[in-house]
């Protein structure tokens, strides 16, 4: 019993080795609830010279707004338009209220570009902000492609960065097509 501490040290070493070797491997960037990832593309242009939109996608939520604040409050929207087809989807938090498709006419994309220019959507180009653990119906995603190859891409799953007036103008434009 003179050298009991050697046996105890060996036992502790064996247990520690087992714990270290058998633990789960984690990714280098685990997504912890509340963790924030902010990506800014410094090369994304803040001014777009093109005016011919070929593809427009915008998903956004107004569930955080009071119904008294705006007629579009309390809903989830998906607005999509390309040269051949368009789609307007309106959902409440829990159910789909309506999805309508349409064929955009020649004036539709001109009006859409006016809204994009008026509210300077390009200033948000390249901004991507994500908070892990939030429900999927928060925030917004914006993607606009032009015939010239230029693009506007931005997202934020915590809040909408476009002004309420811009969202209302887009909804009104897409609702006209129904």
Which stretches of residues belong to each language-model region?
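Feature marks short, highly hydrophobic, charge-poor N-terminal signal-anchor/signal peptide-like helices
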Residues: 1-7
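Juxtamembrane cytosolic interface motif at the C-terminal end of transmembrane helices
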Residues: 3, 17-24
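Core hydrophobic alpha-helical transmembrane segments of single-pass membrane proteins
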Residues: 7-17
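Short, well-ordered, aromatic-rich surface patches in folded extracellular/luminal domains
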Residues: 22-70, 100-107, 111-116, 120-178
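Broad, structure-driven detector of short, well-ordered beta-strand segments within folded domains
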Residues: 66-82
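Residues that act as N-cap/strand-start positions at coil-to-secondary-structure junctions
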Residues: 73-75, 96, 136
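Short, solvent-exposed coil/turn segments at beta-strand boundaries
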Residues: 79-87, 148
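Acidic/histidine-rich, surface-exposed loop or edge segments in extracytoplasmic proteins
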Residues: 86-99
């Amino acid at each position: 019993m003179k050298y009991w501490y050697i046996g105890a040290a060996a036992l502790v070493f064996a247990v520690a080795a087992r714990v270290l070797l058998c633990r789960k491997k984690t990714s280098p960037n685990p997504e912890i609830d509340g963790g924030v990832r902010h990506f800014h593309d410094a090369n994304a242009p803040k001014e777009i010279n093109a005016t011919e939109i070929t593809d427009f996608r915008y998903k956004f939520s107004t569930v955080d707004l009071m119904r008294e604040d705006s007629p579009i409050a309390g809903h989830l929207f998906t607005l999509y338009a390309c040269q051949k087809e368009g789609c307007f989807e309106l959902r409440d938090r829990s159910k789909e209220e309506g999805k309508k498709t349409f064929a955009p006419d020649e004036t539709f994309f001109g009006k859409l570009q006016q809204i994009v220019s008026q509210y300077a959507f390009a200033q948000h180009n390249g901004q991507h902000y994500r908070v892990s653990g939030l429900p999927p119906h928060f925030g917004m995603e914006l993607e606009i492609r032009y015939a010239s190859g230029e693009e506007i891409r931005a997202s934020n799953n915590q809040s909408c960065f476009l002004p309420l007036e811009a969202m209302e103008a887009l909804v009104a434009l897409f609702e006209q097509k129904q």
